[in-house]
Amino acid sequence: MWDPLLNEFPESVHGFRCMLAIKYLQSVEETYEPNTLGHDLIRDLISVVRARDYVEATRRYNHFHARLEGSPKAELRQPIQQPCCCPHCPRHKQATIMDVQAHVPKAQNIQNVSKP
């Protein structure tokens, strides 16, 4: 179990509450399989708590709440049928292809320029 006395404390009471909320949500997250809707929703809720400003937190919460209200409780522990593949989302791992070379610009032949 995580011991708050052995770790660095946030500077404010609000930060401390957020830290405890995140630790609690992480323990709840462990009860869901990684490819389930419930796991995805808990990750969204953690991102709400971690948001730096009010506007961003409100935007994330509204998105989370809409997804939660549109999901039946029976589906929370069921595997997600279509996994998210958004490129900007850090929690979704993109499949990597190791045999494809990185983009390397081709060399161009330049005419010999000499001074007159």
From Swiss-Prot:
Mutation effect (residue 84 to S): Complete loss of suppression of silencing and interaction with Solanum lycopersicum SGS3
Superkingdom of origin organism: Viruses
GO cellular component: host cell perinuclear region of cytoplasm
BP GO terms, sorted: negative regulation of gene silencing by regulatory ncRNA; symbiont-mediated suppression of host innate immune response
UniProtKB keywords: Host cytoplasm, Host-virus interaction, Inhibition of host innate immune response by virus, Suppressor of RNA silencing, Viral immunoevasion
Listed InterPro entries: Gemini_V2, WCCH
Keyword DNA damage: no
Cellular location(s): Host cytoplasm, Host perinuclear region
Pfam families reported in the protein's UniProt record: Gemini_V2, WCCH
Function per UniProt: Through its interaction with host SGS3, acts as a suppressor of RNA-mediated gene silencing, also known as post-transcriptional gene silencing (PTGS), a mechanism of plant viral defense that limits the accumulation of viral RNAs.
Family: Belongs to the geminiviridae protein AV2/V2 family.
Subunit note: Interacts with host SGS3.
Name assigned to this protein: Protein V2
Organism: Tomato yellow leaf curl virus (strain Israel) (TYLCV)
